[in-house]
Amino acid sequence: MTSQRTRERLIQRLYEEGLSNARVLEVIRRTPRHLFVDEALAHRAYEDTALPIGHNQTISQPFMVARMTELLLAAGPLDKVMEIGTGSGYQTAVLAQLVERVFSVERIQALQDKAKERLAELNLRNVVFRWGDGWEGWSALAPYNGIIVTAAASEVPQSLLDQLAPGGRLVIPVGGGEVQQLMLIVRTEDGFSRQVLDSVRFVPLLNGPIA
């Protein structure tokens, strides 16, 4: 089912789980998640669960998309955000409706090609894509006010810290095991502040682009 009622049920569940940013919840409500999964899984698109998208990757559960987006925007609007891990393009689409410009990096070209098509179908034109290694980020267009990483890094990549603007926020799952820690890192005048927030489960952030 992809009816409005199933979407409303999802939003109510996210609200009950403690998510409260009205703008983020409204974007989740109106973004057609069923377009970002294979047709065979479309009936499960509005369940609060991660779903496979091929290439050993998943579309993140809506709670985690909303949670990470809330953390990114908690200090106010952002005009320039880098996303590491385009994946299905769902998180990208959510960001594109909340920030001025999104720069999205994906190592698996086939996934990114599909994501481009989906965002074009939704007429989201403020996203620029790069096929490449997420560990490296996109230094040519740095700095960024916000960086969001949708796969778990074994450690925080120094290259991403270097590409964060003063006052910028990095939301990233960190850890090499089955369960990782969601971290919020903010660039301050004299370095970086780091907060460990939630225990999470993400696919690993891998090196090297794949055609």
Swiss-Prot record:
Keyword Isomerase found: no
Domain of life per record: Bacteria
SUPFAM superfamilies: S-adenosyl-L-methionine-dependent methyltransferases
InterPro entries with a match to the protein in the record: PCMT, SAM-dependent_MTases_sf
GO terms of biological process kind: methylation; protein modification process; protein repair
Top-level EC class: transferase
Pfam families xref list: PCMT
Catalytic reaction(s) noted: [protein]-L-isoaspartate + S-adenosyl-L-methionine = [protein]-L-isoaspartate alpha-methyl ester + S-adenosyl-L-homocysteine
Stretches assigned to coiled coil: none
EC number, UniProt record: 2.1.1.77
Function: Catalyzes the methyl esterification of L-isoaspartyl residues in peptides and proteins that result from spontaneous decomposition of normal L-aspartyl and L-asparaginyl residues. It plays a role in the repair and/or degradation of damaged proteins.
Homology family: Belongs to the methyltransferase superfamily. L-isoaspartyl/D-aspartyl protein methyltransferase family.
Protein name, as recorded: Protein-L-isoaspartate O-methyltransferase
Species of provenance: Pseudomonas paraeruginosa (strain DSM 24068 / PA7)
